[in-house]
Curated annotation (Swiss-Prot):
Mg(2+) binds at E9, Y55, E63. The active site is at D57. One of its GO terms (molecular function) is ubiquitin-like protein transferase activity. Coiled coil: none annotated. One of its GO terms (biological process) is proteasomal protein catabolic process. It comes from Rhodococcus opacus (strain B4). NCBIfam families: pupylate_PafA (TIGR03686). ATP binds at R53, T66, W419. Transmembrane segments: none annotated. InterPro entries: Pup_ligase (IPR022279), Pup_ligase/deamidase (IPR004347). Pathway: Protein degradation; proteasomal Pup-dependent pathway; Protein modification; protein pupylation. PANTHER family: PUP DEAMIDASE/DEPUPYLASE (PTHR42307), PUP--PROTEIN LIGASE (PTHR42307:SF3). Catalyzes the covalent attachment of the prokaryotic ubiquitin-like protein modifier Pup to the proteasomal substrate proteins, thereby targeting them for proteasomal degradation. This tagging system is termed pupylation. The ligation reaction involves the side-chain carboxylate of the C-terminal glutamate of Pup and the side-chain amino group of a substrate lysine. This is Pup--protein ligase.
Length: 452
């Protein structure tokens, strides 16, 4: 499947600092954030004009699920659009707090852990054919996903009883299973709950919940692009060396704690391999696969950055990727800050900087400051991100959903939508079932819109 439906779901961390005496719980802050949404959507679980879903998840975490995308740049644009949507809610909520005499600054973090040790996720979704052998996909993907943090982790300072240590991944410490149907209780690497949001006879949805939330556009593209390419190779019958892990949960933590990528992890049967070895194998197969597939500049870009990042890890010279990969950007930032101020990695100011890197408010968040200074590479433009805030992808089913929502809102009609249904809540209860996520034109939807 060279054209694939993909999406990213991001849960955001929330906190608020107060200027006055009255303090609000995270639940109350979340309610302020979503007050504007509830006022027009009558719910804290809504679909937007750009086809995305916005809702309040378990534990007062706002969650943004992008619309269905079918190429990587489009997906990065819609992922970044989610930050803008949440930033607008943040600004609106701060104004409401001020009007009510509760002075406070609200912070939304696109990260995966809070100071209390709780974790919240960034989930990737990939459409796969129902006909394929799902267990083979899981078997081949698992070693890739366990070691993928080496190339696209968000980076984190982990405070251990002995000392502070820099880790590649925020999510690795919170994963407890390889493949499972649960998402919160056991936090697997791959979630197998079968909810295709499409024709269940043709498709299923691969739900990857091990990844970090990325600030860097290049890292987001690399994270999703490499996974999509490995999936494509599995479907094409490409054979890989057997890297089945003896204990994926131990391995994911060992890999996260080793920025050299050389620490051996145990494979099934007693063999050993490093994260660098494993990623080199997948990358080598990808380079070969590119010779046999239709040319795609985005995929070529992904394979190029993948190779450059592995070279950087091998040589420990990150100069050629230090504007593109989150954990490299962050580690360089920490090292400069430590050198300038003489801080240890365990200093609370480093932890503060770690958190501020993920602050999505423009002009305040550290990543945004680096971006404005030209210290991180971009693959999108502000104009295309702003467009994605209100406009759905034009090549997928999201276009139908977005057009229906826009038309219904402008006509003042009551409606209900989800990923596959578009329904007018009138006497006739007319509903269109959109089971094909690749289809962006549908006469039934056009007729439904025209009837408003």
């Amino acid at each position: 499947m060279q054209r694939r439906i993909m999406g990213i779901e991001t849960e955001f961390g929330v906190t608020c600092t107060f200027h006055g005496h009255r303090r609000l719980s995270p639940d109350e802050v979340a309610r302020y954030l979503f007050r504007r949404v509830v006022s027009w959507g009558r719910s804290s679980n809504v679909f937007l004009r750009n086809g995305a879903r916005l809702y309040l998840d378990v534990g007062s975490h706002p969650e943004y699920a992008t619309a269905e995308c079918d190429n990587l740049i489009q997906l990065v644009n819609h992922d970044r659009a989610g930050e803008r949507v949440l930033e607008e809610l943040l600004i609106d909520a701060e104004q409401r707090l001020a009007e009510e005499g509760i002075g406070g600054d609200i912070y939304l973090f696109k990260n995966n852990t809070d100071s209390a040790g709780n974790s919240y996720g960034c989930h990737e979704n990939f459409l796969v054919a129902r006909a394929g052998e799902f267990s083979r996909i899981s078997d081949v993907l698992l070693p890739f996903l366990v070691t993928r943090q080496l190339i696209c982790g968000a980076g984190k300072v982990l405070q251990t009883p002995k000392a502070a240590t820099f880790c590649l991944s925020q999510r690795a410490e919170h994963i407890w299973e390889g493949v499972s149907s649960a998402t919160t209780r056991s936090r697997p690497i791959i979630n197998t709950r079968d909810e295709p949001h499409a024709d269940a006879e043709k498709y299923r949805r691969l739900h990857v919940i091990v990844g970090d939330s990325n600030m860097s556009e290049s890292t987001t593209m690399l994270k999703v692009g490499t996974a999509a390419l490995v999936l494509e190779m599995i479907e094409a019958g490409v054979s890989f060396r057997d890297f089945a892990l003896d204990n994926p949960i131990r391995a994911i933590r060992e890999v996260s704690h080793d920025v050299t990528g050389r620490r051996p992890v145990r494979l099934a049967g007693g063999r050993q391999a490093s994260a660098l070895d494993i990623q080199r194998e997948y990358h080598a197969r990808a380079v070969e696969h590119l010779q046999n597939r239709d040319p795609d500049p985005q995929v070529t870009q992904v394979v190029d950055l993948w190779g450059r990042m592995l070279d950087a890890v091998e040589t420990q010279d990150f100069a050629k990727v230090d504007t593109e990969i989150d954990w490299v950007i962050k580690r360089k930032l920490f090292q400069r800050y430590q050198d300038r101020h003489g801080f240890e990695l365990a200093d609370p100011k480093i932890a503060q900087l770690d958190l501020a890197y993920h602050d999505i408010k423009r002009g305040r968040g550290v990543f945004d400051v680096l971006q404005r200074k030209g210290l991180v590479k971009r693959i999108t433009e502000d104009e295309t991100i702003e467009a994605a805030v209100d406009t759905p992808p034009q090549t997928t089913r999201a276009k139908l959903r977005g057009e229906f929502i826009t038309a219904a809102q402008e006509a003042g009609r009551d409606f209900t939508v989800d990923w596959v249904h578009l329904k007018l809540n009138d006497q006739a209860q007319r509903t269109v079932l959109c089971k094909d996520p690749f289809r962006s034109v549908d006469e039934r939807v056009e007729r439904l819109i025209a009837s408003m």
